[in-house]
């Protein structure tokens, strides 16, 4: 009897050990995939690429997502547009937030070359803002003037406004490979390269603002979300040395036909330089990158974008004209 009991006990122990091993293997298979990822939409840690010009609003969205899903950790890598998209194509990240969609060649590469399904999520619209020093009285400018300046056909302020004494025009971008540079070449210049000796690139949007604040004859090119970054004293809302330029589609710019990159003028088409913010995904597992991108396009994410001064892509938006009558 003792021998039988020992044998049975031994068999039971072996079966229990096998069962525990199978459970552990099963759990491990669910938590850790073949690619090493363990993230889901509500837990885990990932890095993602983002155009530096969107850093103020992305920081805010990440903060809200962390509060909503406390078991997640999102780490944005702020870079330029070209490097950010290359990171996605090289599978160094599963999400890139930038100012353009996949090109047909990029889409085909991800779909056929990597055997994955690329996804592009339209998040919001922002304006390509032009800022100048507060000492510059020429705060209204035409689209044609901007084209001529970027092509090097106009290099002095007196060629824009005959009465100006500011001298040469210096144009500062955030990065030579940024979405702002690409937007100007593709959308403003119709595919032509910037060809002016007076155009240069700084390190980032903050440096552009600092440069314009200290240079009376400069124009800075930044994303309009920097106009409302209330956490940073260098932003144009609080920086009294900076003013936002108004842009006109007509041949002569006046305060009555020129518009700034604010939501109402983006919506009705009066401001000419509008770009789309995209979330480009290569996330077949639909994990944390997918969850964060679709959080931004959710009603809560769209409201955050709206309060930050961007124009959401989803939801009904009504801009009402208010008439004030003197009594």
Model-predicted regions and their roles:
Residues 1-4:
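Short, Lys/Arg-enriched N-terminal segments with co-localized hydrophobic residues
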Residues 6-16:
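Bacterial N-terminal signal peptides that target proteins for export
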Residues 23-26:
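C-terminal motif of bacterial Sec signal peptides marking the signal peptidase cleavage site
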Residues 28-77, 81-82, 86-89, 121-124, ...:
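Exported/periplasmic ABC-transporter solute-binding proteins
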Residues 81-113, 228-232:
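Pocket-flanking alpha-helical
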Residues 115-119:
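Periplasmic N-terminal soluble interaction domains immediately after the signal peptide in Gram-negative
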């Amino acid at each position: 009897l003792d021998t039988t009991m020992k044998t049975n006990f031994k068999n039971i122990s072996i079966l229990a050990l096998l069962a525990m091993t199978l459970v552990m293997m099963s759990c491990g298979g669910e938590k850790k995939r073949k690619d090493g990822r363990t993230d889901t939409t509500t837990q885990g840690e990932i890095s993602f690429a983002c155009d530096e010009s969107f850093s103020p609003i992305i920081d805010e969205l990440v903060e809200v997502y962390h509060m909503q899903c406390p078991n997640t950790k999102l780490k944005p890598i702020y870079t330029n547009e070209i490097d950010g998209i290359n990171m996605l194509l090289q599978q160094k990240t599963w999400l890139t937030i930038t100012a353009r969609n996949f090109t047909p060649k990029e889409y085909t590469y991800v779909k056929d070359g990597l055997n994955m399904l690329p996804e592009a999520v339209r998040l919001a619209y922002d304006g390509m803002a032009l800022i100048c020093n507060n000492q510059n009285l020429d705060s209204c400018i035409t689209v044609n003037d901007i084209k001529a300046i970027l092509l090097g056909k106009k290099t002095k302020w007196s060629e824009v406004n005959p009465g100006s004494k500011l001298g040469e025009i210096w144009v500062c971008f955030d990065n030579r490979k940024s979405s702002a540079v690409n937007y100007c070449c593709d959308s403003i210049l119709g595919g032509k390269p910037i060809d002016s000796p007076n155009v240069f690139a700084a390190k980032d949007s903050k440096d552009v603002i600092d440069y314009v604040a200290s240079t009376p004859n400069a124009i800075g090119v930044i994303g309009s979300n920097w106009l409302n970054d209330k956490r940073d004293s260098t932003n144009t809302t609080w920086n009294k040395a900076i003013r936002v330029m108004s842009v006109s589609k007509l041949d002569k710019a006046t305060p009555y036909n020129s518009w700034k990159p604010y939501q109402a003028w983006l919506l009705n088409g009066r401001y000419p330089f509008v770009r789309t913010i995209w979330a480009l995904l290569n996330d077949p597992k639909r994990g944390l990158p997918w969850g964060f991108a679709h959080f931004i396009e959710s009603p809560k994410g769209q409201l955050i974008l709206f309060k930050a001064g961007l124009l959401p892509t989803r939801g009904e938006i009504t801009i009402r004209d208010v008439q004030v009558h003197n009594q």
